[in-house]
């Protein structure tokens, strides 16, 4: 059987890694050993941050809802409690978009949540 030197295969692999390392700084972009490490680390960061992005956006929506609810005299936790008791099922993303782009509609939702809360809880806020 003929001897296979794998020059074409390794060249293709190296090109693939260097293409992924395009835009990196220093030897990370053109030295295959260092570029390979940098690309692998970048993929690890990408995997981790795809998970973190979901947490970060949920946290952002909650912060926005808390600020918007406080403008109407409720806290975030009381707003969510009131929505649950009123049977209003809207996710936090939609609520925060409503608070930003449709303040009048958000105010109506807050009023429904406030009406569903017990009287002393609504007065305390």
Swiss-Prot record:
What CDD domains is this protein classified in? Ribosomal_L20
**SUPFAM superfamilies recorded for this chain?**
Ribosomal protein L20 (SSF74731)
Which is one Pfam family of this protein? Ribosomal_L20
Fetch the Gene3D superfamilies from UniProt: 6.10.160.10, Ribosomal protein L20
One of the record's GO cellular component terms: ribonucleoprotein complex
Task: Please name the GO terms that the record assigns under molecular function.
Answer: rRNA binding; structural constituent of ribosome
Q: Which UniProt keywords apply?
A: Ribonucleoprotein, Ribosomal protein, RNA-binding, rRNA-binding
Q: Does the keyword rRNA-binding apply?
A: yes
In terms of InterPro entries, this protein maps to: Ribosomal_bL20, RIBOSOMAL_L20_CS, Ribosomal_protein_bL20_C
Task: Tell me one GO biological process term.
Answer: translation
User: What function does this protein fulfil?
Assistant: Binds directly to 23S ribosomal RNA and is necessary for the in vitro assembly process of the 50S ribosomal subunit. It is not involved in the protein synthesizing functions of that subunit.
What PANTHER family does the database record attribute to this sequence?
Answer: 39S RIBOSOMAL PROTEIN L20 (PTHR10986)
Q: Which family does it belong to?
A: Belongs to the bacterial ribosomal protein bL20 family.
Q: What is this protein called?
A: Large ribosomal subunit protein bL20
Encoding gene (name): rplT
């Amino acid at each position: 059987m003929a001897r296979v030197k794998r020059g074409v295969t390794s060249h293709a692999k190296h090109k693939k890694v260097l293409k992924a390392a395009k835009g990196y700084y220093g030897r990370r972009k053109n030295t295959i050993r260092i570029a390979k490490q940098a690309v692998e680390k970048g993929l690890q960061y990408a995997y981790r941050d795809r998970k973190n992005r979901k947490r970060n956006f949920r946290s952002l929506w909650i912060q926005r809802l808390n600020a918007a609810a406080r403008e109407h005299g409720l806290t975030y936790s009381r707003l969510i409690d009131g929505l649950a008791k009123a049977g209003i099922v809207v996710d936090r993303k939609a609520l925060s978009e409503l608070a930003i782009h449709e303040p009048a509609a958000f105010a109506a939702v807050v009023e429904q949540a406030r009406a569903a809360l017990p009287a002393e809880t609504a007065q305390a806020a």
